[in-house]
């Protein structure tokens, strides 16, 4: 074969290969050959990737061996080595020609496709050149048959084995022109003959050129062979005698061809399974990546997301589809035929089933039709029967409905009759209750008909008035004798206390009625309470009725001429201040229920004052004594009309008073007048077997009155308990301290702690006289109610009893069932306008009441109570006019009469003359120089002006808080710094120390060359006469070792080890180690010899020194005179350093105040010459360092004062104008014997006050929010009892529950709190019951600052509700009326034109709690924590009374005048009447 023929054939094969690969690529991409263009050559990147992925790329092999022949690797290497470098140019030219031929074939194919009808002859191809025209020899290459090799590779895909593998051409090696086809399966078979199987190509083109016969001659050039590896078709059985060749040659190979999963599968199936699993895994990964799937950590699984989740996850969008069609599985024609047959078979079967189903349906319809025709008569009969049953059912239901209606009508009529009967019985019950209340009130009051009694009462009042203010003011202070007696009582046993106070019952007091009925009824106090009966004769009842009627008429006549009706606004107000004040009223007034309680208490209190008032009317010094009751209270009394049965009878008004009881000796301290009256009232309750409510205003001493009652029972009635007192948690310890203070003779058990501690306290408490009083909280008494119910209590006292007004709560039910003899409720809150709450308290007091006939009757139920009093009282509250009907007023009068015996309430306004006065002072303080500088600097900042102009509430509050800090103390705004010097490790001198040494060294380099030491050369011989003796010189000359030394040197020089001949001993040979060591030794010994020679020379000169005369001769001829006079002038001038420091210590302390700006640490070392660069001998340096380490530094104090400067302690006071004023005020208070409380809002101010008080040496105590409740009680008790403590500094946020600081008479507000309620609580801690001196309140205000502006505006706008303190809260009116200009002044806010208020948010204005939270954001963290702790203490009490169930409150706005209800049964016929009579006779239920 010639070279041209070979190139042409190669080009033909390359062209066929390209056609096949294009066709495969088109099928892969589009799954159809409909639009396939065989003339188009793909050169895109996707086509190259397709060839690479399918392993169809065409590359050149370097195998030069003949196909079908096996050659050894050695022979191949030899041929390669021989042919190296040859044929490279020929191969490149051949490849170039092949490409041109392939391109020409594509051009011919495009031309044929464009002109399919034209016939073209054989074209003569264009030769590329001379080299292409040169023919190869015919015998250069021998024709060989093509060998088809099959390679086996288990790792390739099975789908690619079905299609014939095309030929791949790869021009990798230009040296070899052998081509092969790479099949992905990689299967190899043995060699086969060319006649058995031949390779084939499948192409869509039918135009093929005839095969050119090649010459069989062998050429000398290296043979380029084509190695084709094709995939042969599978063996098919075409004859029964045909025997298939087994695929596996052995059994082992056959077994290895299967894989075992759940069952045995073939390799192909296994590969298919693996491929499918890979696709599933890739799909899952793609789903996770695109966001369609998600991984659930909890279930450890992959979950699909919903459509909503897919819409929300916009970040993970699926990738766009890159192909239009998926690759379909390629089936053969036989497979398509089989599938078509299966589909047609199924279609025929479905049609058959459909025809059968339609036939069955038609037959069923025919059958149903004939059945319907046959059953028409029977069906008609059944429908008629069904219709009749429906009519009968409707008739029965109508009759039954009518009977039900008649039954309801009968029940309504019967209920009306029962209600009528109940109203009659209720009126009878109410009459009995009113009669019983009259009896109780009459038993409490004692008629003073006898003139002797009147005289004794006058004497008693004069004795009481003669006690004076001094005796009245000693309620909170104990005399020494009383304290000693209290201590003795606390040490006595119960039997000794009984013996000590047993004789007190025989003591009689002047003015006490010995023959009264009440006294005779209480002679035997140990009888059962049920045995006490309230009995009055008919004459006494009538007389008492006439007395009340006459009293009412007289007072109403007086009030009619002096009082005026209230306005509508005054009637509708229900604030605590009006409920607690005395209200004038007449017959046309509109009294509310809240005012009824105050009026009842006032009437009772006024009745108690009648006898005293008459006895004191002739006393000239009534006002000085302070015992006369308030004249305004008497003039403003209200007594509603009490209509009795006997209206015709009337008598003169008699003076009535509560029976006076003696003050028990067991009580330590003196009761005030109103407290003594309260004790009398409580004692009358006990004597009349009645419970009551002590409702005095907060701060009037309900605790001391209760303790006095228990002491009275112990001393007078010999009733030592046990008593149960239930109080809020926060005041439990306060009650215990009050018992120890006023009644130390009682054994008090404070029941609190953990369950184990409470169990330990209950151990043995059933023994006689184990304790007298048990104090516990509401929460614990309900928790341990089973233990408390088993014990019998003499008195159960509830503090803050208004919190048990909910009768549906479990606490109310539990306390109601306690085994108690008497009950007392203490409350300082006015009772609300709620009939249900009022009934709850009254029923709790009187669940059972004794009657005249010895029977026990319970209190009225809630329904009856609301029926009697509910609607009239609601009508009064909701009324807009001043006139009411007589029935309403009579009902209110009855309510007065019911409540009058059980309630006592006094206000501070009634007893204000018996309390010390309160004075308020405002001290304006000037700002210090530093404060003024910081204040003006902060206000002049651009940021501050922008913040104030912004109008943001929180930003403005933050600015105001900073200004308040400057006013309180500048250290709160900016701490005065501690001055220290800037410390440097090295000074400037150390940088030039080395240079200085170098310069000195260079300057003195030749100094020794020109200067001759005459002393060393013995030329200065005259100096030897002053320090040398002749004997010493002779001895040195005689003892010198000159000869021995010179011999040793010569011997060393002539040592045999030293080489005598040496060229230059200073030059060392570093190339040879031996020579180097020898030369180095010679140099060392020569240097040593020179040193010894010089030493010998100097020693000779020293030994040859001789004096001319000698010092011994000079001493011999010298004459000594008398010693000179001693003088200490020089010793005074040369004092030691330590002495000078001690002498000038005062100067150092006072004037060593200027701290240098910068200091260095190496100055001392440089000055002493101890640095490393100093020219001092190391031995001398070491000696100096040793001496300095042993020496105490005399300059330590001076160095310390100059290195650090602390602010002077006096600057703490002089930096603040308030502290300067406080220093003057405290000095004056200390001299006058006063004790002060200093309150501040900020916790950091307490730290500054501590430093201030320590600086001045005042003894003080501190209480802030971090102080525990137990420690707080101890601190307050110590302050009240220790007069040495002058000052008590407190935080206004430290909580005010149970704090009583009556030991102080001065209150100083260092700064004002945002919440005015806090300031009022702070005042009440000092100005309360128990205070014996006038209270002065000082408020510090910085002038010309925000504080003075706030105070000025507050005073201008302060009216009734401008700053309202209600229920511990404060209104936002304070901030809603003030603007920035009002707070900072017009001078500071000239640039702010808007005068909007600080707080404009309506939500914040309506919610005070929200305002408190906003203000807390501007305060310090410590202050916020303190406020939270205070609120937490309040929440503890709130949790004691918090219940989930609430009592239904009747609406006061409910319309009383209801529309008349239409009578449903009006005009009933005779049938309905018959039905009702039938039901009434009871026949319906038989």
From Swiss-Prot:
One of its GO terms (biological process) is chromatin remodeling. Residues 467-487, 1452-1465 have a biased composition (Acidic residues). The lineage of its organism: Eukaryota, Fungi, Dikarya, Ascomycota, Saccharomycotina. A motif (DEAH box) lies at residues 799-802. One of its GO terms (cellular component) is cytosol. Catalytic component of the SWR1 complex which mediates the ATP-dependent exchange of histone H2A for the H2A variant HZT1 leading to transcriptional regulation of selected genes by chromatin remodeling. Component of the SWR1 chromatin-remodeling complex. Residues 1221-1371 form the Helicase C-terminal domain. This is Helicase SWR1. Residues 193-204, 562-588 have a biased composition (Low complexity). CDD domains: DEXQc_SRCAP, SF2_C_SNF.
